[in-house]
From Swiss-Prot:
Keywords: Pyrimidine biosynthesis, Transferase. Heterododecamer (2C3:3R2) of six catalytic PyrB chains organized as two trimers (C3), and six regulatory PyrI chains organized as three dimers (R2). It catalyses: carbamoyl phosphate + L-aspartate = N-carbamoyl-L-aspartate + phosphate + H(+). One of its GO terms (molecular function) is amino acid binding. It comes from Sinorhizobium fredii (strain NBRC 101917 / NGR234). This is Aspartate carbamoyltransferase catalytic subunit.
Length: 313
């Protein structure tokens, strides 16, 4: 029997160390399932999962779809491009229409911060936030944590340097919250134009130099330069950005010899990370993709099979 005190996964904020550990432990078991020849289980047989993606994301949507199917759920992907949303239907109208179909879980990605939380107030099923604007991306932080824990054996008392476009990154926010909760030391390395106000209050140490920020780091997490979210000139040029804040083999030498190199994807090779590092021996980027399916399996199973969620609205 699973005991988990939440009906939804809207963010890392609000999760305890025990909540996170439970999800990671279950994800460890899901890794074993994914590596078997027979990968499908029946734990969610008869339950329905709807993936509602208002932002394109091939890897995240595919990961959620595969996670649901491996657990035996019926999975529906809603293509927003072909939906009533394009005809003027609001987010709430769409959600209420889907809710009338009695799904068991809605997986939502939206460009507006707080969209998943808003839906959770309106529907009678569980809601999983697959990324909401610049707010949070909880399953990405969980899969990053699982990747680190499996490689390092722990999350506490390690140094994690998160580098690049922190300002526009929901991945950075969720990771800072999770890693602090689990006892890690978190650094952010970025130019002033790509740092959000109040980042120190979230529990991150701020560095403006890669050499200083990466010193003795156990994990180096690079972030994509999100030019599609930029309304102004945040960096002088891509070439200059890579010179000062890109990760290549020489820059990586500042970190520990066994430091992990991570990236949430998709990567901009030659913008924030060099191919020699992305494809090098310290890279765990492919492992992150594998852990993503396992974490999403764990989240679905935990939310839908928990005996301690409280009454539905």
């Amino acid at each position: 029997m699973i005991t988990f005190p939440h009906r939804h996964l809207l963010g890392i904020k609000g999760l305890t160390e025990q909540d996170i550990t439970l999800l990671l432990d279950r994800a460890d078991e899901a890794v074993k399932i994914s590596r078997q020849r027979e990968k499908k289980t029946s734990s969610l047989r008869g339950l329905t999962q709807i993936n509602l993606f208002f932002e394109a994301s091939t890897r995240t949507q595919s990961s959620f779809e595969l996670a649901g199917k491996r657990l035996g759920a019926d999975v529906m992907n809603m293509s927003v491009g072909n939906s009533s949303v394009k005809k003027g239907e609001t987010l709430i109208d769409t959600a209420m229409t889907l809710n009338a179909m009695h799904p068991d879980v809605l997986v939502v990605r939206h460009s507006s911060a707080g969209a998943a939380a808003l839906l959770a107030q309106k529907v009678s099923c569980s809601v999983v936030n697959a990324g909401d604007g610049q707010h949070e991306h909880p399953t990405q932080a969980l899969l990053d944590a699982l990747t680190i824990r499996r490689a390092k054996g722990k999350l506490s008392r390690i140094i994690v340097a998160i580098c690049g476009d922190v300002l526009h990154s929901r991945v950075a926010r969720s990771n800072i919250l999770l890693l602090n909760q689990m006892g890690a030391r978190v650094r952010v390395v970025a130019p002033a134009t790509l740092l959000p106000a109040g980042i120190e209050q979230m529990g991150a140490e701020v560095y403006r130099s890669m050499a200083e920020g990466l010193k003795d780091a156990d994990v180096v997490m690079m972030l994509r330069l999100q030019r599609e979210r930029m309304a102004g000139s945040f960096v002088p040029s891509v070439r200059e950005y890579f010179h000062y804040y890109g990760l290549d083999a020489e820059t990586l030498k500042a970190a520990k010899d066994d430091a992990l190199v991570m990236h949430p994807g998709p990567m901009n090779r030659g913008v924030e990370i060099a191919s020699e590092v992305a494809d090098g021996p310290q890279s765990v980027i492919e492992q992150q993709v594998e852990m993503g399916v396992a974490v999403r399996m764990a989240v679905m199973e935990t939310l839908l099979l928990s005996q301690d969620q409280g009454p539905r609205p």
